[in-house]
Amino acid sequence: MLDNKPFKDIEKQAKHIIDLLNQEGARKKAIALKPFVPAEPLPQTASKFGGRADLPAGESAPTNEKGEPLGMIAQINCAELPENDLYPATGLLQFWMDPNDEECLWGFDYENPTSQKNFRVIYYETLGEPNPDAPFPNVDWDEGGWPIGGFDCESGPLELEYGMTFEVREQGVTASGYDYYDVFGAKWDETYPDEKLPEAHENPYKNQARREALYELTEPFESEEEYSHVGGYPFFVQNDPREEFKELRGHTVNLLTIVSESENEENEDEEIEIMWGDAGAANWLITPEALAARDFTNVAFEWSCG
């Protein structure tokens, strides 16, 4: 039994399971999105965090259920991305949220994560003449604020727009997803049949012993590296909504993850402020079929903090 084995031996076994999962297809390509403070206002067509959206001439910002304009939290100019098989090759993908949500949730509906009443994901296939009157997010800093930038009592709002640079990376299997423990546990029992973990139960209370064993096995290998990205795996600070909402388990594509950042590691003199509550993160997920059809009406959006 595992109780009688040295920890180093158990750790080697756990590492072997993770390596097996990655070899069998768990590794995913991701594109890291690195924010930077632009020296001058970015073009409306540029990839960016926050800022002024590139809306077609005559087009207005999407609105919440009260008819109030949403604020753009991110815009991806697909042609600027490194070569990938996730995003369209051209066009703009925009992510909008409610800057004046009375519950300070910025449009996240924890009872229905795909409800786009107060958030929106919009894809423009072609770039035409932009609407010069496209607004910046209209943020009520006395209430919920906004993840991008901040507010100084003397100078007012700080940067509400950051540029993006891109870096192709690869992510191995991560503990963040709802099915991680199930996948790891099944592979462990298959690989080490004489050292099986406590039996799995649908009842979460009866499953506690197995969950605790899985946590102890995998905790040493959890990555502490957090970065905004498209593709790869989402990063859930708290719970993966797909665990509760089984109808979302087909949402396997990570359309976008934005994490909290309070500094620029490459330039200490450049202040970056992206903050989801208390150092949280946000994720947008989609099904492969909807993405292939360029249908962004059924995207799951969630954010949470520590």
Please name every model-derived segment.
Residues 1-306:
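Preference for intrinsically disordered or flexible, low-complexity segments
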